[in-house]
UniProtKB/Swiss-Prot annotation:
Cofactor(s) demanded: Mg(2+)
Name this polypeptide is given: Ribonuclease 3
PROSITE patterns: DS_RBD, RNASE_3_1, RNASE_3_2
GO molecular function per UniProt: double-stranded RNA binding; metal ion binding; ribonuclease III activity; rRNA binding
GO CC annotations, alphabetized: cytoplasm
Disulfide bond annotation, renumbered to this chain: none
SMART domains on file: DSRM (SM00358), RIBOc (SM00535)
Species this protein is from: Anaplasma marginale (strain Florida)
Subunit structure: Homodimer.
The DRBM domain, residue ranges: 161-230
Length: 232
């Protein structure tokens, strides 16, 4: 990996997001793809974990204020629709994030800079980095800029996604909450296959696969719903 001009990278991110990073090492971590991971170099996966939670929390608060008459189920479905992968990817593409992600030459040649999973992960990592670098005002400004209009135009309640439907199903029957476990990740970096197992106490487990961990969880939830609703 060639040395990275951190100041130039920070300027490009400022132009794309409106946020000026102070900790350039944190920014570098947020934009580093796992294909460049070494023992001495961090990638965006930990910050992605944080950013996913920050995005969900901020959008939840946004919806709570925008729709005072919605019940929990409606708010949950709206939040799921707003933070799903396709929405995050669309926003990542709109700010040109793909070209700023640091990855191996082979990964870029295989289309890694426009890979939906990579774009989703990197944008969530960037939001996590904003949180760590500048606190609430840093990430809220960015999230509101890109998600508020989308939320305001949600005049309907989206249909339930499988994970939400499964959760509400088991809660309504007093069952233990579903547990999701990543079983494996296979395939090349530019086209990974994730396998996730969902289990419900006394009702066994079901395996789902997908091109991202989130999609695999949704597939597993869908299959589990089918299994338990067919019980006598």
């Amino acid at each position: 990996m060639h040395p990275v001009d951190k100041k130039s990278l920070a300027l490009k991110i400022y132009e794309a997001t409106g946020y000026q990073f102070r900790d350039l090492d944190l920014l570098l971590e947020a934009l580093t793809h796992p294909s460049l991971s070494y023992k001495s170099a961090a990638n965006y996966e930990r910050l992605e974990f944080l950013g996913d939670a920050v995005l969900s929390m901020t959008v939840s608060e946004m919806l709570y204020r925008l729709f005072p008459d919605d019940d929990e189920g409606c708010l949950t479905r709206k939040r799921t629709a707003l933070v799903r992968g396709s929405e995050v990817v669309e926003i990542a593409r709109s700010i040109g994030l793909g070209e700023l992600i640091l990855m191996s030459g082979g990964e870029r040649t295989c289309g890694g800079s426009d890979n939906p999973g990579t774009l989703e992960n990197a944008l969530e990592a960037l939001i996590g980095a904003m949180y760590m670098d500048g606190g609430p005002e840093a990430y809220r400004s960015f999230i509101h800029k890109h998600w508020l209009a989308r939320a305001q135009h949600m005049s309907y309640t989206p249909p339930q996604d499988p994970k939400t439907a499964l959760q509400e199903w088991v809660q309504g029957r007093g069952w233990a909450m579903p547990l999701y476990k990543l079983v494996s990740k296979s395939g090349p970096e530019h086209k990974p296959v994730f396998a996730v197992e969902v289990s419900i106490q006394e009702h066994g487990n079901v395996l789902g696969t997908g091109s991202s961990k989130k999609l695999a969880e949704q597939e597993a939830a869908k299959l589990m719903l089918k299994k338990i609703t067919e019980l006598p």
